[in-house]
Amino acid sequence: MRLTNKLTKNQQLLTVTMEECGELIQACSKVARFGFEEKIDEVAKEAGDVLAMIELMVEYGWITQEQLDNRIPIKRNKLKIYSDILK
């Protein structure tokens, strides 16, 4: 269903990004429930879709690649403190 006549481009970008993030959340949940081997391909698919939406946010000038690049080490440092993911 095309929403172009109902939503602005900005609204479409926000809405589709929210939907894609939700689909990634759901895929991660299924890995936790059903096992890594069974569902990890879905995580890759949905993560790629989220990355595509982030790229569009950069193209629209909402965020910059520099902002993203600066944020990554901050998050990784937090993970070192609050989780075992990077230990």
Placement of each model-derived feature along the sequence:
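Flexible "arm" and connector segments at domain edges
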Residues: 1-87
